[in-house]
Amino acid sequence: MNELKNDRLLRALLREPVDTTPVWIMRQAGRYLPEYRATRARAGSFMDLCQSPEMACEVTLQPLERFPLDAAILFSDILTIPDAMGLGLYFSEGEGPRFERPVQDAAAIRALGVPDPETELRYVTDAVRLIRRELDGRVPLIGFSGSPWTLATYMVEGGSSKEFARIKGMLYDDPSTLHHLLGVLAEAVTVYLNAQIAAGAQAVMVFDTWGGSLTPEGYREFSLAYMQRIVAGLTREHEGRRVPVTLFTKGGGAWLEVMAETGCDALGLDWTVNIGEARRRVGDRVALQGNLDPAVLYASAERVRAAARKVVEDFGPGSGHVFNLGHGIHPGIDPEKVAALVDEVHKAGMK
């Protein structure tokens, strides 16, 4: 594989010295970019786009052509695993992801198997290999998966949810069945991320989008424990380098200390936590990623720059900070604001 020309991201995730703060953006390949919208229209459907390695590669690289970002992130979806389990993923306008065959009883859950990434999810590993080849060592490639808890919420609810009525009912009434589902998903995520690493992903991230919906006790038992299991099972050295692992729980600011004990290398933060305070709480155990409010990008370029500077300054001196938004970039953002953001982070983060 090609030598990395810019390893800023990997160094920061491992709290090694860097020349400036690295930056990438959740959903950096997305609807705010006109070139993405053109490729998406050409693909036909969102899943057709995800399942074409060539198109997934094309959109993964699009933001790097515009902005001097310090990483590429695989273009895919967190729900590829349940789709490969046979649940029938589809996207409906205005409703987001839905499953034709949700799993809502013990029999359906116990019938689930762990997908083979090189057969059922071959389009993902093929995309990773193609992106690595096209990047030619320019920046590292990040692979990712949803967390077991987050995947389970979609699988049991049948799609997005505000109340989580079905899965919370299962959690309180039939926890053993839910634990079985989470155990299968933890194994599936571990196998899936290891396949991404083998194919060329140089860092990986676990997105726990719905962990913040749990109680403190519920979070430890039904989300964190399974992410810890994944971290323990991941390939941590590949191509002669350490493969950093980042955990991100949206709404998880209260639990940073226990998250830092999982063995991961970095924690993602949403915008409800001050990054300097988070750093004081976790000490030097992990790097931190984040955490600008994505809505700041609706403001003027000057305000975007000021807000970016504040996040960098709040983190303070030294390595261990990867700048990002606190969640995915909104579709209506002007790409020029992103250009201002990236430029300001690199200026403000000079070491």
Swiss-Prot record:
Keywords: Cytoplasm, Decarboxylase, Lyase, Porphyrin biosynthesis. InterPro entries: UROD/MetE-like_sf, Uroporphyrinogen_deCO2ase_HemE, Uroporphyrinogen_deCOase. It comes from the Bacteria. The record marks D77 as: Transition state stabilizer. SUPFAM superfamilies: UROD/MetE-like. Pfam families: URO-D (PF01208). Its EC number is 4.1.1.37. GO terms for biological process: protoporphyrinogen IX biosynthetic process from glutamate. Substrate binds at R27, Q28, A29, G30, R31, D77, Y154, T209, H327. One of its GO terms (molecular function) is uroporphyrinogen decarboxylase activity. Coiled coil: none annotated. Pathway: Porphyrin-containing compound metabolism; protoporphyrin-IX biosynthesis; coproporphyrinogen-III from 5-aminolevulinate: step 4/4. One of its GO terms (cellular component) is cytosol. The keyword Lyase applies. It is found in: Cytoplasm. It catalyses: uroporphyrinogen III + 4 H(+) = coproporphyrinogen III + 4 CO2. PANTHER family: METHYLTETRAHYDROFOLATE:HOMOCYSTEINE METHYLTRANSFERASE RELATED, UROPORPHYRINOGEN DECARBOXYLASE. NCBIfam families: hemE. Homodimer. Belongs to the uroporphyrinogen decarboxylase family. Catalyzes the decarboxylation of four acetate groups of uroporphyrinogen-III to yield coproporphyrinogen-III. This is Uroporphyrinogen decarboxylase. It comes from Thioalkalivibrio sulfidiphilus (strain HL-EbGR7). The lineage of its organism: Bacteria, Pseudomonadati, Pseudomonadota, Gammaproteobacteria, Chromatiales.
